[in-house]
Amino acid sequence: MGKEFSGVLNGQGLKVALVVSRFNEFITSKLLSGAKDSLERHGVSADNTDVAWVPGAFEIPLVAQKLAKSGRYDAVICLGAVIRGSTPHFEYVSSEVSKGIARVGLDASLPVIFGVITADSIEQAIERAGTKMGNKGFDAATQAIEVANLMKNLG
């Protein structure tokens, strides 16, 4: 039988960067708090956690790429909130942000985790930032720890 690989939820020694959108900060600040909570609970030192603020979600992939390619981090967590309005802007931004974040991870061979809420309403975004639907920032940080450790196990 062949080998089976998995990542563990132990963040000791991991260095993590977070890229956070300032737009919709009343949501993204809750995502950031959730992410920091997960990192701390799983043993990532606050000294090994860096945060880069960007103006909006569209700028997340560029900054994530710079951090991912720096060689200083085991994972990059991308946090933002894109809320549908009355124009097609939502579709353009959410599509390009998700594609950009995925490309950064593939290009850098590093876990670059998508923690961007795409919601039809402010209420939906609030639900996903720590109320009814959990906190997507917490979830993204937990995923980052697991995948960073999996990547280390894969060599």
Swiss-Prot record:
Its EC number is 2.5.1.78. It is an enzyme of class 2 (transferase). GO terms for cellular component: cytosol; riboflavin synthase complex. It catalyses: (2S)-2-hydroxy-3-oxobutyl phosphate + 5-amino-6-(D-ribitylamino)uracil = 6,7-dimethyl-8-(1-D-ribityl)lumazine + phosphate + 2 H2O + H(+). GO terms for molecular function: 6,7-dimethyl-8-ribityllumazine synthase activity. The keyword Transferase applies. Disulfide bonds: none annotated. Keywords: Riboflavin biosynthesis, Transferase. This is 6,7-dimethyl-8-ribityllumazine synthase. The gene is ribH.
